[in-house]
Regions:
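Glycine-rich phosphate-binding loops of nucleotide-dependent enzymes
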Residues: 1-188
């Protein structure tokens, strides 16, 4: 169910059309294409040119510049994606989600290859999106991050729902106990 209705999501583009976007742990960019082309891949803005429909590059670059500003990035929309850092590529993926006016953004282990400064930048983007009403599903094993940015924690174990709790007052020990299904005596 999504927004009170039963839905059948068939592929990522279908999910995106419903306002659900995902940034995967393993990014799959097209490094030889521009930032703008990666953001609009498969859904380029178009315009009429005589009897033909063509890609509206001007609109794509303008829209991309606005999106990049919204996710706190200031590089050229025409820049090749392969020239960017991993965290910048991740920001491009977030911009792609924002471009589709996503209402739900799923982030799968988003900090796994980021430096501490890049993590802070990501958290600022997440806070901005939350203020805009975007729901963030943050998948992580990093308890400090979860407790820092989450309003609620939902725990699943072996594909089964365990429970959902407000973050206020939660401890790392409580979360880990629910994740593994037993009390832990030693953490390494």
């Amino acid at each position: 169910y999504y927004e009170g209705e039963k839905v059948n999501i068939t592929d990522p583009l279908d999910a995106l059309s419903k306002g659900i976007a995902m940034v995967h742990q393993e990014l799959q960019p097209v490094p030889a294409r521009s930032v703008a082309e990666n953001i609009y891949l498969g859904r380029y803005p178009t315009k009429k040119f005589g009897p033909f429909t063509v890609v509206d590059h001007e609109k794509m670059y303008e829209d991309t510049a606005a999106l990049l500003k919204r996710v706190r990035m200031n590089f050229d929309p025409k820049q090749k994606l392969g020239e960017l850092s991993v965290s910048q590529m991740q920001s491009v993926e977030i911009a792609k989600a924002v471009s589709a006016n996503c209402k739900v953004l799923i982030l799968d282990e988003p900090t796994s290859s980021l430096t501490s400064n890049e993590v802070e930048a990501l958290f600022r983007i997440i806070e901005d999106l939350k203020k805009e009403g975007v729901s963030i599903v943050y998948i992580s094993h990093k308890m400090d991050e979860i407790l820092r940015i989450s309003d609620e924690v939902t725990i699943m174990r072996d594909g089964q729902y365990i429970g959902t709790w407000d973050c206020e007052g939660l401890t790392t020990d409580f979360i880990i106990t629910k994740m593994v299904g037993r009390e832990l005596t030693n953490l390494y």
